[in-house]
């Protein structure tokens, strides 16, 4: 808030003030008010009529100040009164603004004794104002007090002074001294100020240095942090590159190993194929199928009515020149297409055996002749059936001799085990067609024995000394008519009993009654071990399946056996199959199933043996025997046969 202003009308205000306080001036009052629209104080009016005249000049719309001199009769000097007039119509805001101006106006007009606040004429009462002025100043009415006052006035002495004449020298010294101290004080202040500035500068420099050091340290930390980050990133990149390189190396090694494995597999496959092709090529060189030899032997055995005594067996190793090992090797398209179907033989360990041509006792042609005459081409050995066991079992297994008027083989009922073989044995018609008086050439070579690789399909063992024939007093077992002598029985015989119905000439030996088949010479299906699984197994199974399909396809064709054999098969009653170790019925029927040679070398086992079928018009399936002779027979189809060892007589 702005204060009251005296500068605008200062001279006028002071002049009117001097007129009021002057003893010689007739003016005893002055009236002041504000200039329009401002707080500057100015003189409004003045006069000599006292309070009564002054009270007539106040206005109710303004704020005004009246300065008046009042003379009291009891007082020697006049008193001064300041009247603060605030009209009733003045706004409140203006009243508040001017309330603070009263003290400054009283200070400007020096000597004011009483300040009277008035808003109407009634508030300006001369008697009341005089009373206020006379409080404490009236003359004491007590005479004692009056005498005391007079006595004090009489005893009053003049007042002394301390004024002295001014000495310039002293004054100069004093002034100089004061100036010196003032100068010293100023210099001290300047020095302190400079020290403060220096301290401030030092503090500022320290702060700047500290901030610079902190900045450098921060930059160093950031640099180390960046370097650490770069090292970590570089290490991470190296680790990733190493991992990628290791992954590529592993993939490369895996690819190399995979390629090597594939190359090994391809080489193994090519080697297997080459072995298969070599075996197939060697097998394909055979001019005839050895299976025909077995069929011919079965024809001879079925045609012969004489039995061979079991006691005439010779000891020694078993000679098997007709073992068919071609089927034990892997089959091929050339062998299956160039040779007729063959009965599958069991697989025996595929390793090469030494040349066995020296073990053959005779050539194939001589062998065929001897077989027709009742001479066994290969004797039994402990590998197939022990001789002692055969001799001990023979008396127990003998059956009563049948009457001489027993039915012929053409009408004899054959048991299912024998009929299932269906060997192409010659019947009575075939026998009649042969010239009875023709003597076979002592050493002819049959057409089927020609070829350099026939010996590769046969295995023989050197025979030992033949055992003596049984005594004549011993009862000769009579073979049931109509049942063909098994091929193994022909091998075990010593040639003493010639075949009765054979068309070939027989040696001059007494024909004994036929003997029943020995139970000990048969092999049961339960006694056969499972052949080892080797390389030749898979191909052998495939060959077996192919041959079975061909046999089923040719089942409806006429069988090459004789009519008598067929009639005996068709008319014979059903007889349960005789397994190994069983005895045939003693009523003159077949005592034991005719045992084909190839059955000993067949592939079938207990789980693979076909169930016996009912007799029907179609040709029955051949019987497969599980247990081969206990001899070391190997797959040696690929073994070349020397030219000088082609004949069977090299071993004699």
UniProtKB/Swiss-Prot annotation:
Keyword annotations of the record: Acetylation, Actin-binding, Cell junction, Cell projection, Cytoplasm, Developmental protein, Differentiation, Neurogenesis
Organ and tissue specificity: Brain neurons.
Biased composition (Basic and acidic residues): 211-236, 288-298
Domain ADF-H per the UniProt entry, residue ranges: 5-134
Subcellular location: Cytoplasm; Cell projection, Dendrite; Cytoplasm, Cell cortex; Cell junction
Domain of life, source organism: Eukaryota
Spans annotated as Disordered: 211-350, 371-652
Main location: cytoplasm
Modified residues (N-acetylalanine): 2
Gene Ontology annotations for the cellular component aspect, listed alphabetically: anchoring junction; cortical actin cytoskeleton; dendrite; growth cone; lamellipodium; postsynaptic density; postsynaptic membrane; site of polarized growth
Positions of disulphide bridges: none
Composition bias, Acidic residues: 540-554, 640-652
InterPro entries on file: ADF-H, ADF-H/Gelsolin-like_dom_sf
Biological process according to GO: neuron projection morphogenesis; positive regulation of axon extension; positive regulation of dendritic spine morphogenesis; postsynaptic actin cytoskeleton organization; regulation of actin filament polymerization
Identification of the protein by name: Drebrin
Species this protein is from: Gallus gallus
UniProt lineage: Eukaryota, Metazoa, Chordata, Craniata, Vertebrata
């Amino acid at each position: 808030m702005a204060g009251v202003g005296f500068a605008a009308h200062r001279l006028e205000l002071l002049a009117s003030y001097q007129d009021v306080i002057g003893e010689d001036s007739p003016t005893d009052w002055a009236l002041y008010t504000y200039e329009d629209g401002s707080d500057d104080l100015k003189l409004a009016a003045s006069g000599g009529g006292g309070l009564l005249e002054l009270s007539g000049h106040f206005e109710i719309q303004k704020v005004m100040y009246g300065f008046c001199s009042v003379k009291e009769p009891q007082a020697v000097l006049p008193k001064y009164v300041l009247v603060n007039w605030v009209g009733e119509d003045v706004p409140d805001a203006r009243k508040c603004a001017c309330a603070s101006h009263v003290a400054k106006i009283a200070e400007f007009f020096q000597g004011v004794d009483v300040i009277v606040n008035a808003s109407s004429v009634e508030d300006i009462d001369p008697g009341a104002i005089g009373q206020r002025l006379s409080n404490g100043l009236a003359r004491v009415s007590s005479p004692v007090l009056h005498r005391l006052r007079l006595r004090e006035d009489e005893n009053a002495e003049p007042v002394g002074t301390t004024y002295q004449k001014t000495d310039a020298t002293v004054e100069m010294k004093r002034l100089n001294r004061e100036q010196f101290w003032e100068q010293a004080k100023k210099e001290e202040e300047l020095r302190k100020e400079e020290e403060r500035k220096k301290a401030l500068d030092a503090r500022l420099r320290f702060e700047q240095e500290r901030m610079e050091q902190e900045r450098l340290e921060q930059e160093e930390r950031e640099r180390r942090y960046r370097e650490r980050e770069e090292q970590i990133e570089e290490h991470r990149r190296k680790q990733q590159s190493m991992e990628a390189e290791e992954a590529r190396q592993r993939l490369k090694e895996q690819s190399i190993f995979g390629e090597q494995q594939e190359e090994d597999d391809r080489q193994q496959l090519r080697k297997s194929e080459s072995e298969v092709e070599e075996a197939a090529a060697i097998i394909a060189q055979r001019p005839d199928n050895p299976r025909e030899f077995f069929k011919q032997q079965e024809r001879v055995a079925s045609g012969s009515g004489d039995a061979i005594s079991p006691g005439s067996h010779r000891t020694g190793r078993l000679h098997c020149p007709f073992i068919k090992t071609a089927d034990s090797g892997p089959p091929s398209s050339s062998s299956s297409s160039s040779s007729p179907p063959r009965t599958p033989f069991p697989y025996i360990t595929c390793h090469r055996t030494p040349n066995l041509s020296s073990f053959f006792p005779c050539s194939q042609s001589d062998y065929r002749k001897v077989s027709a005459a009742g001479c066994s081409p290969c004797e039994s050995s402990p590998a197939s059936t022990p001789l002692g066991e055969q001799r001990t079992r023979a008396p127990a297994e003998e059956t009563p001799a049948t009457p001489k008027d027993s039915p012929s083989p053409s009408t004899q009922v054959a048991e299912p085990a024998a009929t299932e073989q269906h060997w192409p044995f010659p019947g009575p018609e075939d026998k009649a067609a042969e010239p009875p008086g023709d003597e076979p050439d002592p050493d002819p070579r049959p057409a089927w024995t020609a070829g350099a690789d026939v010996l590769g399909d046969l295995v023989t063992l050197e025979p030992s000394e033949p055992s003596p024939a049984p005594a004549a007093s011993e009862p000769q077992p009579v073979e049931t008519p109509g049942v063909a002598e098994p091929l193994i029985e022909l091998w075990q015989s010593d040639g003493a009993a010639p075949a009765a119905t054979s068309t070939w000439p027989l040696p001059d030996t007494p024909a004994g009654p036929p003997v029943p088949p020995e139970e000990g010479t048969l092999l049961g299906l339960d006694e056969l071990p499972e052949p080892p699984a080797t390389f030749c197994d898979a191909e052998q199974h495939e060959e077996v399946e192919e041959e079975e399909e061909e046999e089923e396809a040719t089942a409806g064709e006429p069988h090459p056996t004789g009519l008598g054999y067929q009639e005996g098969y068709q008319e014979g009653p059903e007889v349960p199959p005789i397994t190994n170790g069983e005895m045939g019925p003693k009523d003159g029927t077949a005592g034991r199933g005719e045992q084909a040679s190839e059955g000993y070398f067949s592939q079938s086992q207990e789980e693979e043996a076909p169930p016996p079928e009912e007799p029907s018009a179609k040709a029955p399936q051949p019987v497969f025997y599980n247990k081969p002779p206990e001899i070391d027979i190997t797959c040696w189809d690929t073994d070349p046969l020397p030219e000088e060892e082609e004949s069977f007589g090299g071993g004699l």
